[in-house]
Amino acid sequence: MKKQLLSALIGVSLLVPMAASAADYVIDTEGAHASITFKVNHLGYSYVVGRFNDFSGDFSYDAAKPTAMTVNVTVNTLSVDSNHAERDKHIRGEDFLNTGKFAKATFASTSVEDKGNGDLVINGNLTLNGVTKPLAIKAHAVGEGQDPWGGYRAGFTGTTTFAMKDFGIKMDLGPASSHVELDLVVEGVRK
């Protein structure tokens, strides 16, 4: 009797659909399928563009429940690269990133808003130059699926802008140069 009851319970449990849950992903920086690039207006005449070559992170994501998404990223600020060695040295210095004291920047999500059609707003806290402030990233879910190597991937793009002074960056190149624009491309491999 006990065996029949146990068998019946197992059988019923297999028929009940399992609830979808978020999958965990590691950001694919090894395969260069992710990037963090920046753009700053240079004196109102042009732009300085660059990137961070060394960062890592992870996220959890379920397309059926995008508001449950979480994101965590750590950036090695020493890896700043604007394609000009002297400028990079200045950016790493006390006028800007102050990497001697703060060699890392972090972003940790706090909430996600679903705007429909794959558009999201990822709210979180950015810690840069020893200062933590709220930051909203406008993001878009590009797609997800199996890769040719037997893994599963999900990808996103994102943009955000912040004022340098909000993060204790005191260098003043004028009002045209007061903000940083970040462009993000993230592809994650399911863990």
UniProtKB/Swiss-Prot annotation:
Q: Does the keyword Cell cycle apply?
A: no
Q: Which UniProt keywords apply?
A: Periplasm, Signal
Q: GO CC terms on record?
A: periplasmic space
Q: Which family does it belong to?
A: Belongs to the UPF0312 family. Type 1 subfamily.
The cross-references to InterPro entries, in alphabetical order and at most eight, read:
Lipid/polyisoprenoid-bd_YceI, TTHA0802/YceI-like_sf, UPF0312/YceI
Protein name from the UniProt record: UPF0312 protein Sputw3181_1309
Q: Which SMART domains match?
A: YceI (SM00867)
First and last residue of the signal peptide:
1-22
Cite a single Pfam family from the UniProt record.
YceI
The record, for SUPFAM superfamilies, names:
YceI-like
User: Where does it localize?
Assistant: Periplasm
